């Protein structure tokens, strides 16, 4: 059954609960990170981002965002330690962004919104594949990185330059030899909490790891994101903007910080 969810007035986040009742669940994402309430947990290990041998495959406009997909048939591109037990393989990354530079991120920090947010999606190898992993509360680890307006990040440029060839829903092109390490900030200090996918089916299977330090993106780079379309090629044009879910109630969850 194909649910036509999106980000518009009639199919946007406030409607998702009708088809996906877990939208009102106990561990939904994103959230606002209140830095005063987030407790430093000295037992949290430093995050190990082992992206030495990434094999990127293609980039695709899925009508909600665009995904850069990776070969996840081996442990060459993994996330481990930090709050995680075991090894999590990178399967894809995507972004959420706004119609203007003042909004676009899904998570917020003390209610502050960033221009965009990068999600690097990893699945727990103990479950064998992504489809099985999402059925478990510790199935996924998503590394969230804020983008703030500033100088252009060189590591983003190869992505940005490809967007014009995947303007509409369903379009994809080969996208090889991309190094996701170019998307990481210098510091890997993070906040972590148990949460969910931020798009339907909104499954509560994610250990969120949100980095404190943003990367920068230029206004020119952001404009290229906004040139994408939600629609398929022959359909009326709908600019792909504001593809973010608003923050959800914390419902008693504790956000932990890896830093003082």
Swiss-Prot record:
Per UniProt, residues of the Alpha-carbonic anhydrase domain are 3-259
The record lists substrate as bound by 198-199
EC top class, as a word: lyase
Q: Name one GO cellular component term.
A: plasma membrane
Q: Which UniProt keywords apply?
A: Acetylation, Cell membrane, Cytoplasm, Lyase, Membrane, Metal-binding, Phosphoprotein, Zinc
Q: Which residues carry this modification: Phosphoserine?
A: 2, 165, 172
Cofactor(s) required, per the database record: Zn(2+)
Localization terms from the record: Cytoplasm; Cell membrane
N-acetylserine occurs at which residues?
A: 2
The protein's predominant localisation is cytoplasm
Record GO biological process: angiotensin-activated signaling pathway; carbon dioxide transport; positive regulation of dipeptide transmembrane transport; regulation of intracellular pH; regulation of monoatomic anion transport
Which intervals of the chain form a coiled coil?
none
Q: Residue numbers for the site described as Fine-tunes the proton-transfer properties of H-64?
A: 7, 62, 67
A GO MF term: zinc ion binding
Binding locations of Zn(2+):
94, 96, 119
- The positions flagged as active site in the entry are 64
Q: Which Gene3D superfamilies match?
A: Alpha carbonic anhydrase
Which reaction is the catalytic activity of this chain?
hydrogencarbonate + H(+) = CO2 + H2O; urea = cyanamide + H2O
Q: What does this protein do?
A: Catalyzes the reversible hydration of carbon dioxide. Can also hydrate cyanamide to urea. Involved in the regulation of fluid secretion into the anterior chamber of the eye. Essential for bone resorption and osteoclast differentiation. Contributes to intracellular pH regulation in the duodenal upper villous epithelium during proton-coupled peptide absorption. Stimulates the chloride-bicarbonate exchange activity of SLC26A6.
Q: Which family does it belong to?
A: Belongs to the alpha-carbonic anhydrase family.
Q: How does it assemble?
A: Interacts with SLC4A4 and SLC26A6. Interaction with SLC4A7 regulates SLC4A7 transporter activity.
What is the designated name of this protein?
Carbonic anhydrase 2
Q: Which organism is it from?
A: Oryctolagus cuniculus (Rabbit)
């Amino acid at each position: 059954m194909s649910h036509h969810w999106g980000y518009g007035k009639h199919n946007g986040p406030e409607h998702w609960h009708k088809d996906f009742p877990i939208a009102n669940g106990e561990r939904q994402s994103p959230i606002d990170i209140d830095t005063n309430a987030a407790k430093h947990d000295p037992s949290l290990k430093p995050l190990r981002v082992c992206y030495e041998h990434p094999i990127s495959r293609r980039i695709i406009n899925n009508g909600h965002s665009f995904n850069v997909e990776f070969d996840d048939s081996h442990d060459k591109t993994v996330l481990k330690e930090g709050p995680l037990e075991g090894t999590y393989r990178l399967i894809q990354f995507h972004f959420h962004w706004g119609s203007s530079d003042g909004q676009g991120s899904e998570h917020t920090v003390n209610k502050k919104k960033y221009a965009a947010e990068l999600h690097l999606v990893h699945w727990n190898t103990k479950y064998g594949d992504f489809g099985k992993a999402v059925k478990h509360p510790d199935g996924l680890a998503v590394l969230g990185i804020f983008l703030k307006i500033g100088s252009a990040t060189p590591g983003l440029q190869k992505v940005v330059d490809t967007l014009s060839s995947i303007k509409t829903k369903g379009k994809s092109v080969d996208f090889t030899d991309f190094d996701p390490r170019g998307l990481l900030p210098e510091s890997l200090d993070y906040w972590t909490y148990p949460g969910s996918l931020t798009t339907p089916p909104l499954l509560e299977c994610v250990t969120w790891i949100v980095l404190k330090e943003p990367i920068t993106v230029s206004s020119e780079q952001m404009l290229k994101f906004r040139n994408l379309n939600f629609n398929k090629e022959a359909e009326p044009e709908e600019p792909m903007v504001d593809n973010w879910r608003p923050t959800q109630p914390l419902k008693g969850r504790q956000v932990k910080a890896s830093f003082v």
